[in-house]
Amino acid sequence: MQYKPYIPQSISELLDQLAHLRLASPTFKDETGYLPRQSIDTAFYSLNEGLLVARKTLGEERCMALRVLSDKMRALFESDPDDKTGDTHAGRMLTHEMEDILRSVRKRT
């Protein structure tokens, strides 16, 4: 059976996904055994596809800015898989920037 990652369907669910990214980084390996196929690939697939789902609500400019931050965050996590160089921390801080953008949209709607 193939693992199909959940795709966030709203701004609120995107905020939840960012919290998950912060907690599961930098390896995104499931320690519980419930999601053994979860990985950095599936985590960022979920986030990026969720951004596409919310594109109309976000607007093109915000959506692209969030995608750039997502790509930067992934690169930081990949460069520090053992959480020793500070890049993982920098990646986690990007989740806060993304949350600020998402919350600003949520307040307008």
Residues covered by each model-derived region:
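Amphipathic alpha-helical binding modules
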Residues: 71-109
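Amphipathic alpha-helical interaction modules
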Residues: 20-69
